[in-house]
Amino acid sequence: MQSNISIYVLTVIGSCFYNPFILTYECRDDCCNGRYGPVPAPWKVLNCTKTGPGCPDSGYLLTTSENKTYCITGNETDKGNYPQTIGAIFPNCSGMNVGAGRLITRMLEEYPRGKSPSNNSINNIKISC
């Protein structure tokens, strides 16, 4: 009886270690792996990298100065306070701003000569998902 339990335990452990789901992308550093969250402030982002081939979640990995990694995708641009600045500041994130599923569209307002705009309306940014 004890040997049957041991074989069962080894079988369960073995199937966990050789699960193709885990081996393909679950633990890869170049996939999102559930690292979603609010978009960090742009001055805290040190690096921006597109997710790797074969990842189930296409997006961009933002690494911050606090050594945290966040993944943002087209459906997540409304999270955080700074999504509109990421593509402008980091050139390797510029792919987020093109194509039918682009993340950001900008609408610039015109102002009468000699009148300075308020801080709230310098760039009227519209986020489109």
UniProtKB/Swiss-Prot annotation:
One of its GO terms (biological process) is immune response. It comes from the Viruses. Keywords: Cytokine. The lineage of its organism: Viruses, Varidnaviria, Bamfordvirae, Nucleocytoviricota, Pokkesviricetes. GO terms for cellular component: extracellular space. InterPro entries: Interleukin_8-like_sf (IPR036048). This is Putative CC-type chemokine FPV061. Belongs to the intercrine beta (chemokine CC) family. Highly divergent. One of its GO terms (molecular function) is chemokine activity.
